[in-house]
Regions:
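Beta-sheet-dominated scaffold domains
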Residues: 2-147
């Protein structure tokens, strides 16, 4: 998957096929074909999200990828289910307010022991918050900031 800074064209997140390509039908559905090229066609996701200028917010574990979209003030998870705003689970206003006002880095990390995605906002609120898949929410706010 490729993350772009801002929405470009129809989508800002794209899947790039490897060793295959896609042929599109008139209805927009794709047929995947074999190809000798290492990288195939970029297929856009139907979303309005991008990683803004904060690639350091990206973290992944197993089949899930997490990142922030500062421009839209959201935290996102990309998985087999598609793109989802995990910031909507109890922290929508917090991220709308604090991501947009963040002037520096937005650090993302994944804690494999606790199975949590951590987001650190050092300049706007000087703390970290963690998203947990097991409760589908944000169980903790931490006083440390990831470096």
């Amino acid at each position: 998957m490729v993350k772009q800074a801002l929405k470009i064209g129809r989508a800002s997140c794209r899947e790039i096929l490897t060793n295959k390509d896609a042929l599109f039908n008139a209805d927009g559905s794709a047929n995947v074909t074999s190809n000798n090229a290492v990288l195939g066609q970029a297929i856009p996701y139907n979303s309005n999200y991008g990683i803004s200028t904060n690639p350091e917010s990206f973290a992944d574990f197993t089949y899930r990828a997490y990142f922030t979209d500062k421009k839209n003030g959201v935290v996102l998870r990309h998985s087999a289910d598609g793109m989802e705003e995990v910031s909507n689970y109890g922290m929508k206003d917090y991220f709308k307010d604090n991501l947009r006002s963040q002037t520096g880095y937005i650090y993302g990390s994944y804690d494999e022991k606790k199975n949590q995605y951590n987001v650190s906002l050092p300049t706007s609120v000087n703390n970290s918050v963690s998203y947990s898949e097991s409760i589908n929410g944000w169980p903790s706010r931490k006083s440390f900031v990831t470096e």
